[in-house]
Amino acid sequence: MTNQPTEIAIVGGGMVGGALALGLAQHGFSVTVIEHAEPAPFVADSQPDVRISAISAASVSLLKGLGVWDAVQAMRCHPYRRLETWEWETAHVMFDAAELKLPLLGYMVENTVLQQALWQALEAHPKVTLRVPGSLIALHRHDDLQELELKGGEVIRAKLVIGADGANSQVRQMAGIGVHAWQYAQSCMLISVQCENDPGDSTWQQFTPDGPRAFLPLFDNWASLVWYDSPVRIRQLQNMNMAQLQAEIAKHFPSRLGYVTPLAAGAFPLTRRHALQYVQPELALVGDAAHTIHPLAGQGVNLGYRDVDALIDVLVNARSYGEAWASYPVLKRYQMRRMADNFIMQSGMDLFYAGFSNNLPPLRFVRNLGLMAAERAGVLKRQALKYALGL
């Protein structure tokens, strides 16, 4: 097939691209989603995906508005109500949903569960066309339209193309959009474990000079551990069998973790990227295609959902006023709404990373003093929590 017309072509149908496609379709846009492969089917008695996202209250509201949250809950997710962080035992900061008069802070959700819930909704929507397997090989702009050439010869002509294709975005590269980027001197290991005790509804993170150690409670007696460390150390951990990894967990995680049995693990390097622009005429970037962040506070996908909410709002409003909704002036409104917010969150995580990634005694004293002050900050602490939750 050639020259297939659509209003909006979205490259990438994952957690962010899928949500954006569904939201735009629900507002009457015709949407074509180009994705390499369908998400894996959900298997109820399977062990959890090692890739876990902490979905904030604001992101849950977005997913409820899209009509997919019930499907997520019908598969599996786990609420969390408290978030605790510390380095010294005398310097804890506790964020509690009750401080904001909320029932919970958010949910721990496997990435595959979110992807499957969104995919099912996309398959059922009459305004959505799925091109899967689909692989973008070229992108050209002709006469105020974007022309997407796919592997196999199909050409899609769209009024707007959106790159939701991840950190190594082809759309961003083909559009010639540069990035400001650097590699952190840390990698991250995600470990799926079974707990001897109920994991509860609190997530916690202990800072160490080598990197944080974090605990994310999941369904039943499952949990996810997050181990940040030097790339060399993470490679050592990757080469261990599960019994050896279990011994390392017991040595290097706080005693409150209790006895856990690791059953799966995966690792990835940590890179900060920020696109120099989010938009061009008839083109926009969302999610990791536009920005990646240190996963310290679990904000990656939540920032992507803020992008989704803002871009839908901009496009729907522009169309309602009869504007050329795919034009550069309109798309710049989206960039203005999101670029600064994403930069602030990235910079905040960079400060935490820099402040907690060394073992100088004076700095250790200052940062723990800062944690103690944060715990007693009252209104400022609540405002920081509201900002992180997108409220």
Where are these regions (language model features)?
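C-terminal helical "tail/cap" subdomain of flavin- and related membrane-associated enzymes
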Residues: 313-391
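Conserved FAD-binding catalytic core of PHBH/FMO-like flavoproteins
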Residues: 63, 145, 160-265, 270
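Conserved N-terminal helical subregion
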Residues: 3-4, 76-174, 182-187
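N-terminal Rossmann-like FAD-binding beta1-loop-alpha1 element of flavoenzymes
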Residues: 7-33
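Glycine-rich FAD pyrophosphate-binding loop
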Residues: 25-48
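Conserved Rossmann-like nucleotide-cofactor binding loop
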Residues: 16, 39, 168
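N-terminal FAD cofactor-binding segment of flavoenzymes
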Residues: 47-84
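FAD/FMN-dependent oxidoreductases across multiple families
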Residues: 235-321, 325-326
